[in-house]
Amino acid sequence: MSEHVRTRSQSSERGNDQESSQPVGSVIVQEPTEEKRQEEEPPTDNQGIAPSGEIENEGAPAVQGPDMEAFQQELALLKIEDEPGDGPDVREGIMPTFDLTKVLEAGDAQP
């Protein structure tokens, strides 16, 4: 039996100082087992159906056709108006309150 030994000088003579990215030995590719496939795939039978049997709408309804751009603009406006803290109670707090008696008295006063 003869032993073949590769030396560093042989690889540098070829101009290939980098080690090969090819794996040495055999590579075994394992397919996922049936149990793992079932865990990875979400159930498709009852997606979007609530326990009560009603269909849940996630997000905005699908709109197709020429009205798509108008729908997207309207949806953008609704999102802006529905920002947290923009409810009617907040708007009332921002509006100034006037004491009508003081306003009327100020209007009747003469310089």
Swiss-Prot record:
Which regions are flagged for Polar residues bias? 8-24
Per the record's keyword annotation, is Phosphoprotein included, yes or no? yes
Keywords per UniProt: Phosphoprotein
Residues annotated as carrying Phosphothreonine in the record are 97
* Positions of region (Disordered): 1-67
Q: Which InterPro entries match?
A: GAGE, GAGE_fam
Q: Which PANTHER family does this UniProt record tie to the protein?
A: G ANTIGEN FAMILY E MEMBER 3-RELATED, P ANTIGEN FAMILY MEMBER 5-RELATED
The family assignment reads:
Belongs to the GAGE family.
Q: What is this protein called?
A: Putative G antigen family E member 3
Q: What is the organism of origin for this protein?
A: Homo sapiens
Gene for this protein?
PAGE2B
